[in-house]
Structures are given as structure tokens and as C-alpha cells.
């Protein structure tokens, strides 16, 4: 489950609820940059993540972090995402790696999966076309006018219709023992409906197995 930071701060109440409904993973889906390395709320965030990890363990779940591309900005020569995983031990924080944003951030997704072998629980399979720039995050929001503008230069695609090398991503995921791979496409594209995009991704995966 993707659970907003504000909900995680409620502590036992939130974690017990998700445990009671059978969740295995509780995921930090997004955090403002002020909470990451170099930000004024970074120390506070790291301490809270440790508490969240302990609570997840208490209730029989694992805490994961879902990345975007801004975690691939550097502070003192290191990526913010690497500094996060350095600060929080693997028993308290696992990885839900979004391969689209890894690529947009400038790294090879398969290589980055292998970098965190033993910590990767979930891999998001997400394809895209276009280049980094503009308001890419409008595509994961609710403002239709912004979505249309952003889609002009960058769009999410059904698997196999964009720039990603999924055979290498899937091979790396298998090598490191990822428990789940999840197809994700935030918005439909290519003139297709949501269900048509899902069908295209399913058929693509069938074609490479």
C-alpha cells in the first residue's frame, strides 16, 4: 500500500489498519525534497523513517520507499537516494524501485536494481517516451490541463512502447530476488484507453517470456 507521510505519522493506528487488511508492504510513495539529504527537514525525516520501519516490523510488514527522479540529485557527490539507504538500515527500509524514474534520473535501471540486491522487494515496471523536462509530475496529478501540456514532451507508455529495456530489468529483478514486479502506467497514452494500455502491457510481457 502507498501511504502518505501524514498518515504514517499517526503511528500504530495506521500500521495496525494496514496489517489488519493483509498488507505485506507499506510504502512511502512521495516526499518533498526538503525531507531528503540537503533539506532542512532531513534529520527529522530519517528519524521518522526509522520509527516507521520499526512499526512495520511490529505489525508483520515491510516498509519500502518509492523513488522518483529527484532523488537522483547529488549532495556532496552522492545521490539523495543512496544517502537515504545509507542512513536507514535494510531491516527497517526496503526498496520499491520505480524503473522509469531511475532511467529519467540518469541511471540504468537493471544496474541500479543489482546495486541494491538484498534490499529490493518490489520493482515497478513503467515505460515512457520523451525526455526529462517540463512539468512531468503533472502526469501523476489531477490537473487535466497540466497533464495535456506535460504529455507533449514526456508521456508514460504501455510496456514495450517506450524506451525501457525490460528483458534486462526483469533479469536483474530475478537475480536479486525481488518478490514482486508491478506494471505501472500513471496515465493512458497513444490514444488508447486505460484498459487497452493494460492489455498492451500484458501482451508485451507474454511476448518476452
State each model region's role:
Residues 161-174:
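A short, acidic, amphipathic alpha-helical segment used as a generic capping/interface helix at domain edges
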Residues 1-95, 115, 195:
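Active-site acidic/histidine proton-transfer and metal-coordination neighborhood
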Residues 167-169, 180-183:
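H/E-rich (His + Asp/Glu) clusters that bind or coordinate divalent metals
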Residues 3-9, 31-32, 100-108, 163-164, ...:
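Short beta->alpha connector loops
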Residues 192-209:
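C-terminal helical cap(s) of enzyme catalytic domains, especially alpha/beta-barrels
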Residues 57-163:
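Acidic/histidine-rich catalytic cores of soluble enzymes
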Residues 182-193:
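A short, acidic, flexible beta-alpha connecting loop/helix-capping segment that sits on the rim
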Amino acid at each position: 500500500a502507498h501511504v502518505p507521510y501524514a498518515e504514517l505519522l499517526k503511528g500504530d493506528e495506521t500500521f495496525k489498519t494496514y496489517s489488519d487488511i493483509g498488507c505485506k508492504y507499506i510504502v512511502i510513495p512521495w516526499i518533498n525534497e526538503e525531507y531528503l539529504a540537503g533539506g532542512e527537514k532531513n534529520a527529522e525525516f530519517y528519524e521518522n523513517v526509522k520509527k516507521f520501519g520499526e512499526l512495520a516490523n511490529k505489525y508483520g510488514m515491510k516498509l519500502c520507499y518509492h523513488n522518483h527522479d529527484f532523488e537522483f540529485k547529488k549532495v556532496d557527490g552522492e545521490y539523495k537516494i543512496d544517502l537515504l539507504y545509507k542512513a536507514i538500515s535494510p531491516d527497517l527500509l526496503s526498496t520499491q524501485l520505480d524503473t522509469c524514474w531511475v532511467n529519467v534520473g540518469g541511471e540504468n535501471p537493471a544496474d541500479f536494481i543489482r546495486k541494491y540486491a538484498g534490499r529490493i522487494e518490489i520493482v515497478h515496471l513503467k515505460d515512457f517516451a520523451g525526455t526529462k523536462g517540463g512539468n512531468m509530475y503533472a502526469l501523476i496529478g489531477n490537473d487535466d490541463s497540466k497533464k495535456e501540456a506535460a504529455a507533449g514532451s514526456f508521456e508514460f507508455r504501455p510496456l514495450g512502447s517506450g524506451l525501457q529495456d525490460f528483458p534486462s530489468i526483469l533479469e536483474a529483478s530475478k537475480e536479486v530476488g525481488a518478490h514482486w514486479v508491478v506494471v505501472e502506467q500513471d496515465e493512458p497514452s497513444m490514444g488508447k484507453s486505460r484498459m487497452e494500455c493494460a492489455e498492451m502491457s500484458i501482451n508485451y510481457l507474454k511476448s518476452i517470456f
